[in-house]
Amino acid sequence: NTEFRNIWDLYLNNSTTDPVANNTATGDAAEAEMKEGKAVFYQNGTWEYDALSGALGAESIQMIPIYMGVAGEEKAGLASGTENCWAVNKNASEADQKATLDFMKWVVTSEEGTTMMAEQFGPIPFKSAKTPANVFFADANALLAAGNYNVDWAFNATPNVDEFRAGVVSALQAYGKEQTDDNWAKVVSAIVDGWAVQYAATH
């Protein structure tokens, strides 16, 4: 609670956007500010590598953990996870199902497939995965090699994710406009009570 508020205050009060207008900021604007040198920190993911490296050069960018004063975070690695998975449509024809499975196998085992995956998508969880040029993955691997732990996330575990997020975002926006203890208590409620409500609705 306190640690999250501290990092959120850091974001709000040191942003290129006025805290009162934080709900008008966009990801595209944040990316542009980073590329133009108007911002030095930009919270995003490995998918931003091409856009940032093209403008700034791979040697000028690095991904680091978000430090909030939480016990043990000095050994934290990067937050890493996915909300995507591969699936085969059970209603497709047998021929289409086989073609899909054959393609999946090709992507993760063949020279051409694994090269394409590394260059266009990054590392994949398979023994023959190639190392991508994306330095953000190298940063993550270096932290793991140094004995740091991975910070796992999986948004598909969030109950009623769209409704839950909407409640949290609304509370955070209200707090940005008026950074009071009462408004922060509403953020906490949106996360804690909101999760309980959405969990109950889906179980």
Stretches with model-predicted labels:
Residues 31-32, 36, 47-51, 66, ...:
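Mature extracytoplasmic/periplasmic domains
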Residues 36-45, 59:
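Alpha-to-beta junction loops
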